[in-house]
Amino acid sequence: MDRYFFLQDATTVARLLLGNLLIRKINKKEIVARIVETEAYMGIADSACHSYGGKRTNRTNAMYSIGGYSYVYMIYGMHYMFNVVTADKNNPQAVLIRSIEPISPLLGKKSALTNGPGKLTKFLNIDLTFNKVDLIGNNELFLQRDLNLDFNIVCSKRININYAQEDDINKLWRFYIKDNKFVSRR
C-alpha cells in the first residue's frame, strides 16, 4: 500500500482496509492477519474522535501525521488501541482496527484472541512503542494488500462512543466482513 491509499478520508480507508493484511514481525517470525473490522474517526468535526474540535495533545499528536502512520494509545490503563492515520497532514482522521483474523498457520484460529481492539494488540504485541510509526516501509509492523477481497461489508454504528453527540453516535462508520467469526460484535 502506498501513501496515496492512506490520504483518503477515514471512512473510505476503513472500508478499503477490510480483507487486507496486517503483518507483525517478532523475533524474525511473521504474524499475518486479515483485517475484518474497522471504525472510522473523521477528525475535528467528529465528536467521537480524539481530535474533535482541533484538540491536540501529546496523546493525539500522532493523528496529525500524514496518512499511513500509526496512532496507538492506551485505554483503561491496560489495553492498547491500534489505529491507522488517514488523510493529509494536520487533518487528524484515523481508522481503529477492531478485529483481525489470524492467517499464519501456526497461530491457530481462536477468535477469542483477536476479536477486539485490545485483544488484537495483545496478540500482536503492539504497544506505545508503535505510536507514530510510518507503516509504509516499516519492517516490524505494516499493511499489505490481499487479492482475495470477495466478501460483503456490513456498516453499523461505532461501539462504546456514548460520550459523543447523538448524530455522531448514529453514523454508520463501523465496517466489518459479513459472517466473519472474528468480528467483535454483530
Swiss-Prot record:
BP terms from Gene Ontology: base-excision repair
Organism expressing this protein natively: Borrelia garinii subsp. bavariensis (strain ATCC BAA-2496 / DSM 23469 / PBi)
GO MF annotation terms: alkylbase DNA N-glycosylase activity; DNA binding
Protein name from the UniProt record: Putative 3-methyladenine DNA glycosylase
CDD domains: AAG
Keyword Hydrolase: yes
Family note: Belongs to the DNA glycosylase MPG family.
UniProt xrefs under InterPro entries: Formyl_transferase-like_C_sf, MPG, MPG_sf
One Pfam family it belongs to: Pur_DNA_glyco
Keywords: DNA damage, DNA repair, Hydrolase
Family annotation (SUPFAM superfamilies): FMT C-terminal domain-like
NCBIfam families: 3mg
EC number: 3.2.2.-
Gene3D superfamilies cross-referenced by the UniProt entry: Methylpurine-DNA glycosylase (MPG)
Keyword Hydrolase: yes
HAMAP family: 3MGH
EC class (word): hydrolase
